[in-house]
Amino acid sequence: FLSLIPHAINAISAIANHL
């Protein structure tokens, strides 16, 4: 589960950057 956290943060960051 901990290994998924950076991926989730990266996805959120990419979405925020797209907005």
Curated annotation (Swiss-Prot):
GO cellular component, one term: extracellular region
Functional summary from the UniProt entry: Has antimicrobial activity.
Keywords per UniProt: Amidation, Amphibian defense peptide, Antimicrobial, Secreted
Name of the protein in question: Phylloseptin-J3
Keyword match Secreted: yes
Compartmental location: Secreted
Major place of residence: secreted
Organism: Phasmahyla jandaia
